[in-house]
């Protein structure tokens, strides 16, 4: 599912909201998550999961084409850990779909 499909689904489930308003809300939520992560904050959505930033140290890498060793700078990468409720729901739905197959 891409962002536009998410916006469309939310708008369909909430007919009192205009699709443009839903799009603005979704964009605002995503912007706030990114801003918080950029500050180094952890963003926790209970039952859904938690977003955080992991810092990877500088290391020696290798160019796969030439085999040459190259330095790779340190970097920060986003990390998402699923919440307990999400894991349980996914496992429950997977078990149900496998049983009916």
Curated annotation (Swiss-Prot):
One Gene Ontology molecular-function label: structural constituent of chromatin
Protein name: Integration host factor subunit beta
Keyword Protein biosynthesis: no
RNA-binding keyword on record: no
Keyword entries, A-Z: DNA recombination, DNA-binding, Transcription, Transcription regulation, Translation regulation
SUPFAM superfamilies, per database record: IHF-like DNA-binding proteins (SSF47729)
Gene Ontology process terms (BP): DNA recombination; regulation of DNA-templated transcription; regulation of translation
HAMAP family listed in its UniProt record: IHF_beta
Function as written in the Swiss-Prot or TrEMBL entry: This protein is one of the two subunits of integration host factor, a specific DNA-binding protein that functions in genetic recombination as well as in transcriptional and translational control.
InterPro entries: Hist_DNA-bd (IPR000119), Histone-like_DNA-bd_CS (IPR020816), IHF-like_DNA-bd_dom_sf (IPR010992), IHF_beta (IPR005685)
NCBIfam families according to UniProt: hip (TIGR00988), PRK00199.1 (NF001222)
Recorded name of the encoding gene: ihfB
Entry similarity comment: Belongs to the bacterial histone-like protein family.
An example Gene Ontology CC term for this record: cytosol
Description of how the protein assembles with itself and partners: Heterodimer of an alpha and a beta chain.
Pfam family, one: Bac_DNA_binding
